[in-house]
């Protein structure tokens, strides 16, 4: 049985199989025990990356007839595997699915380092019937070589709460791609990049408007309040702050691009490779985005 969805499921994993065998042996010996299902928590090594999952994915929820932003919500973040100012940190992409009551449906993580650790933590919370609010309060071991003061798991909880309370709305990279430059929705949307100039020169979405976050309040008149504004930065913290500024100044349709430029580039790596010849050898990262996310 699927522990999350309470539906029949076949999940051929060694861990659940061994636990079932133990329960079977206990019952044969006269000890009454029950198996309460599996969440399908698993991990795989894919060249230099690790991919880990637990619970249901979005494809499964849709197949059950569930509707996004009604029956379930999703959050996607790009974080550092540990504090960005400590050498060796890598980008970790994480996605989580949850209900309007904060119930956790599942999560996925991909990155060179730290994916298995975070999924194990989320799986433990899910097994205890925890919610996004438990992720917010989760206290994990912290030191710069190992994590950030706000761990990526905490950031998932913070961002999920922001969604449920209406502080932020997101647009996915896939939804951006569906809007071709000639389409009516694209004409009615502004992609606002709030990173610094050197970051914008390194790589940006074609057709996007560049206004650094620090200059946004003084340049609001350059943006059309009647258009949807999709805000993007490196990982999300500056885009979230920019979105709040816009919303507080009368912009009614504001979205933050999920995962930021870091995730967008991972989905458009061929476009990024074409521009490598114009990228300086060293591009300093912005301290605002190091080891942080939306909060």
Positions of predicted regions on the chain:
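Rhodanese-like catalytic fold shared by cysteine-dependent sulfurtransferases
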Residues: 133-144, 148-189, 197-230, 234-295
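Mid-to-C-terminal Rossmann-like scaffold of FAD/NAD(P)H-dependent oxidoreductases
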Residues: 2-112, 144, 148, 152-181, ...
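A short, polar/charged loop-to-alpha-helix boundary motif
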Residues: 113-132
């Amino acid at each position: 049985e699927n522990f999350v969805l309470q539906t029949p499921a076949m999940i051929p994993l060694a861990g659940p199989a061994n636990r079932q065998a133990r329960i079977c042996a206990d019952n044969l010996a006269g000890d009454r025990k029950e198996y309460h299902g599996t969440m399908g928590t698993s991990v795989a090594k894919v060249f230099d990356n690790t991919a880990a999952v637990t619970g249901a994915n979005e494809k499964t929820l849709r197949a059950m007839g569930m509707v996004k932003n009604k029956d379930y919500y999703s959050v996607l973040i790009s974080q550092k595997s540990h504090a960005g100012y400590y050498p060796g940190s890598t980008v970790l992409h994480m996605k989580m699915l949850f209900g309007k009551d904060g119930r956790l449906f599942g999560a996925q993580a991909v990155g060179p380092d730290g994916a298995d650790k975070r999924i194990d933590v989320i799986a433990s919370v899910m097994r205890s019937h925890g919610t996004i609010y438990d992720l917010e309060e989760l206290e994990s071991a912290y030191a710069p070589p190992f994590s950030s003061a706000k761990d990526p798991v905490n950031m998932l909880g913070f961002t999920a709460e922001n969604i449920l309370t209406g502080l932020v709305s997101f647009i996915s990279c896939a939804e951006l791609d569906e809007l071709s430059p000639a389409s009516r929705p694209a004409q009615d949307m502004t992609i606002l990049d709030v990173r610094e100039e050197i970051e914008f020169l390194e790589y940006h979405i074609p057709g996007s408007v560049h206004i650094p976050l620090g200059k946004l309040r003084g340049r609001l008149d350059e943006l059309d309040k009647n258009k949807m504004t999709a805000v993007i930065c490196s990982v999300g913290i500056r885009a979230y702050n920019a979105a709040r500024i816009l919303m507080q100044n009368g912009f009614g349709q504001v979205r933050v691009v999920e995962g930021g430029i870091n995730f967008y580039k991972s989905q458009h790596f061929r476009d990024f490779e074409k521009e490598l010849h114009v990228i300086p050898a060293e591009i300093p990262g912005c301290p605002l985005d190091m080891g942080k996310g939306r909060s």
